[in-house]
C-alpha cells in the first residue's frame, strides 16, 4: 500500500497542519533527526499494510497525531511521550522492536511504548474495566504515569472525533468505554 492511498487529500492537509503544530508545541525537546526517523518508521508501517483504520474509519496516524497534540498542548508532555505515542503502533504491529526504538530514541521512549502496549493488551482482555482490581492492575501494568495520561488523551481525542458519527450505538459504546477509561486510577 502506498502512503498516498492511505491518506485522503483532506487527511494529507490535516497531517501537515498537525505536524507543524506538533513541531511548534514540542519546541526544542525533539532532537535533531527525530522527525525524519519517525517519518521513516511510519512510512514503513503504512507501506507494509500493518495498521488499519478503526470502525469509524479514523486514520490511525492522524488519530495519533491529534492525540500527540493533546498530549503536548493540553497536558504539557514532551519528546518521550510524543515519540512513544507516535511509534507504539509500529512496535505493536512488528514493523520495529522496542529494542530498536531504545537504540534510536532512548530508554524513555521505549519504556512508554512498552507501557502503552501492555495497557492496550490489558484493555482488550478485560471486559470489566470499572472494577477496583482492574484499576490497580492498570497502574501496575503502566509503571509510568505518563502512559496513563497518554491513554486519557487518546480517549478524549476519540470522543472528540466520533461526536458526529452517524452510528449511534457504536458511538455510545465508545463513549461508555472511553468514559470509564477516563476515570484514571490514582495511586
Locations of regions flagged by a protein language model:
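Active-site helical microenvironments for divalent-metal-assisted chemistry
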Residues: 1-187
Amino acid at each position: 500500500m502506498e502512503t498516498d492511498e492511505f491518506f485522503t487529500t483532506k487527511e494529507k492537509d490535516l497531517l501537515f497542519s498537525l505536524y507543524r503544530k506538533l513541531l511548534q508545541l514540542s519546541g526544542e525537546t525533539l532532537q535533531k533527526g527525530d522527525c525524519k526517523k519517525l517519518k521513516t518508521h511510519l512510512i514503513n508501517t503504512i507501506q507494509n499494510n500493518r495498521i488499519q483504520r478503526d470502525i469509524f474509519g479514523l486514520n490511525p496516524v492522524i488519530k495519533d497525531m491529534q492525540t500527540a497534540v493533546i498530549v503536548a498542548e493540553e497536558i504539557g508532555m514532551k519528546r518521550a511521550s510524543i515519540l512513544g505515542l507516535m511509534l507504539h503502533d509500529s512496535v505493536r504491529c512488528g514493523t520495529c522492536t522496542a529494542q530498536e526504538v531504545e537504540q534510536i530514541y532512548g530508554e524513555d521512549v521505549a519504556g512508554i511504548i512498552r507501557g502503552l502496549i501492555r495497557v492496550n493488551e490489558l484493555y482488550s482482555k478485560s471486559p470489566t474495566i470499572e472494577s477496583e482490581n482492574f484499576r490497580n492492575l492498570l497502574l501496575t501494568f503502566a509503571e509510568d504515569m505518563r502512559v496513563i495520561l497518554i491513554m486519557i488523551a487518546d480517549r478524549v481525542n476519540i470522543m472528540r472525533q466520533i461526536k458526529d458519527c452517524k452510528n449511534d450505538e457504536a458511538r455510545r459504546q465508545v463513549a461508555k468505554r472511553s468514559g470509564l477509561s477516563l476515570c484514571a486510577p490514582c495511586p
